[in-house]
Amino acid sequence: MSSASVNQQACDLTNKYRYKRFTTTLLFRDLRFAKGAAGSGDSFPSFDLVATNGDHLTNSVVFGDKPVLLVFGSMTCPMTASAAPSLLQLYDEFGDRVKFIMLYVREAHPGEHFTQAETMEEKLEYARALKEFYDIPWTVAADNVDGDLHRALDPKPNSAYLMKNDGTILFRSLWAADKDAIRQALDAAAAGRVPIRQQSTALFGPVVRAMGKVQEVMERGGPQAVRDLWRAGFPMALAGRVATLFSPLSPDQRGIAAVLTLATGTVVMIGVLGAWVMT
């Protein structure tokens, strides 16, 4: 293969990773782990991350004294917003026995206010914004602009990985908002045990609860982020908009209320149409 072909392939990978617009294809890819992606029993890939304070985090620095929970996140990810409160609670519970790291990866829903970072300086700026916005007390770091570690694992927007102190993956969760599954895994790892469950791929609960954060987070990204979600993920955009009608409720409850409202409306509409057809 010629050097020109290799360079073109590298450029294509970069463009796909640092996408400018959210698409339906990306939405469906985010709903499950890729076949063959790193999981329980695998060694964590090599990495060299930069923390928001400028420190470099490598395998030898991160692993050694205690288990490590690493979570993906970004400023325009509703799942990150939904997971933040439960992660803060888990940190209060396990932070003295498990090392927590938030990895800023790439913007889930890029827009005018938060475009995809094109330089390491910009990526670190976004990582600092993430740490400040959610008042994260543990280490927040950034992958490089091409997302080498993110892609080596499985480039999901808000998954979580729990490792032994030697870097062996014990558990992974598709969504960091799956608080109960992550707590059980943390409890086992903190006690030196292997978690009974090696992964969580729960979809309905975490995603439904996150609907209460969708509109707020899309607006944070900018008008483009809002438009792209309506185009690429209409049901999610609609649920997020309906959730704003339940503002007195907590974000989790707003998401549940929105989905129940839409489901009830759909059933009623089907019933009315059925009755009309039968007349």
Residue spans of the language-model regions?
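Non-globular targeting/processing and membrane-anchoring segments
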Residues: 1-68, 176-279
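Short, compositionally biased leader-like segments
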Residues: 2-21, 117-137
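Extracellular/periplasmic catalytic domains that process cell-envelope and extracellular macromolecules
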Residues: 40, 63-64, 95, 153-155
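A short helix-to-beta-strand connector/capping loop
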Residues: 43-45, 96, 135-138
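Short active-site neighborhood of thiol/selenol oxidoreductases, capturing the structured segment around
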Residues: 56-88, 99-104
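Conserved catalytic-core segments centered on acid/base and nucleophilic motifs
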Residues: 69, 78, 90, 160-163, ...
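Structural microenvironment flanking redox-active thiols in thiol-disulfide oxidoreductases
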Residues: 81-134, 148
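Thiol/disulfide oxidoreductase modules built on the thioredoxin-like
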Residues: 134-136, 142-185
